[in-house]
């Protein structure tokens, strides 16, 4: 789950990490009220969407007067914005964040994440903030510093001070940096986060460090115990079909192709998409119907796939381990009847009760194309889509 900047800053502030004063507004007049309450300008007005790159897209404005604040908010609110991170998708701007705007002396980068390679929680820091860390890694890798945290010791103040000195901070700032690192570690663990990125972590003209922007990713598997984070979810920023899928507890990701996929198991689902690509097709989605799939779940999965008008064919690839192939077959037959599937459907079944499942499909009288294996199924669905065009 992703979060808006204002939500990220709220969490940072709760854990003692300094952020500029600010508040969100839903109308231009509210934006002016917020600016006035913050005191004398200047201010920043920032569009709240689930994406970076807002500045280049016109979503971050420096304002010297309340008239500027009102104009900036009016230009953003109620519109949609795409950035280099949204892959052409336009996201609605329902809120703007109005904050104080201090003069930036220096921009740093700081993040904390799970490093699967070292199996540790890892900090990444750089003296080059305000730009994409991938760009820094490619052009000046010597400016990036990493710290793998020992699970027993945790992160200590001396880790942060050492990091701070490597970034060129003075003694006072290095102490602040250490405090931020320690608090960030606590936030990361207590909220079950997968990533926290502060970019930039800036030194302002008062000589102190502030988190000017924050990006959070949470571990959805821990959502059951993170009610505060779940309440922050903004479904208007998400793909509508993916939201529906999450409510049904189906793992679904929209893709750009025209061949819908229904598979059980994430690994098999990814392999299925790969084999479709190898056979000249383009998957329209990732869909893991889950090991505990039942008839109704299969029907809902078909509805999700066919909610996209781009889908011109469907490949159902099921390995019956926990789930039974005959039950999947019953779900496919019911789905084709209920949803009114008008595109070619290729089905590959293997595993528990496979013969019973195949017999049900044969006896259904429906134009369902059987496949012997994953490659055969991919070839058949690609061919069927071409022939139907």
UniProtKB/Swiss-Prot annotation:
CC terms in the record's Gene Ontology section: succinate-CoA ligase complex
Any GO molecular function: ATP binding
Residue sites binding substrate per the record: 264, 321-323
Pathway stated in the Swiss-Prot or TrEMBL entry: Carbohydrate metabolism; tricarboxylic acid cycle; succinate from succinyl-CoA (ligase route): step 1/1
Keywords recorded for this protein, A-Z: ATP-binding, Ligase, Magnesium, Metal-binding, Nucleotide-binding, Tricarboxylic acid cycle
Catalysed reactions listed for this entry: succinate + ATP + CoA = succinyl-CoA + ADP + phosphate; GTP + succinate + CoA = succinyl-CoA + GDP + phosphate
Protein name according to UniProt: Succinate--CoA ligase [ADP-forming] subunit beta
Organism: Xanthomonas oryzae pv. oryzae (strain KACC10331 / KXO85)
